[in-house]
Amino acid sequence: MTQPVPPSLVLRPEVIERFDRGNGVVTIPFVGKWNCEGNRVTTGMTVFSPGTGIPLHSHNVEESVLVYEGEATAVVGDDEFDLVAGQATWVPAGVPHCFRNRGEGSMTIYWVYGGRDVTRTITATGETFEHLSDSDRGAGPARQGDRASRA
């Protein structure tokens, strides 16, 4: 099997250590400062069990999210969208957003951040922490009332 020429990477989800966000939400980190020098994007996948989500939050960088599998509800600012596999969002830095699994099976998203140093700010509390740090484990049951204006 051919290996990529460094500093290139080939990432296989089945061998990547998962980041358990709690309550049935698991992240598989792909490209980031943990494995790539000089990267300008941070990428990965997050798998949501039925009825779960991540609280309304914002980032210090832009983010694009592709629904890879399942059915999602995305809240972006004051707008709410139902999405299915193959549909995507783009969220500018600083805009509150969240994703919930609205389906009966697993929902998987593929995310891309436009930066190397990514933070998450929880809208309800104003708490900011580094993406995928120990503080970044606040997943839980999907909250239908998540809206940016309810911060």
Language model features: what each stretch is:
Residues 27-31, 44-59:
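Conserved short histidine dyad/triad with adjacent acidic residue
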Residues 35-39, 48-52, 71-73, 115-118:
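Short, charged/polar surface micro-motifs in flexible loops or helix N-caps
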Residues 46, 90, 105-121:
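A short hydrophobic beta-strand segment most commonly corresponding to one strand
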Residues 50-52, 60-61, 79, 95-96, ...:
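A generic "binding-loop/recognition-motif" signal
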Residues 54-56, 74-75, 91, 97-103:
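Short beta-strand His + acidic residue motifs that chelate non-heme Fe in jelly-roll/DSBH
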Residues 62-63, 67-72:
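Glycine- and acidic-residue-biased ligand/ion/polar-headgroup-sensing regions
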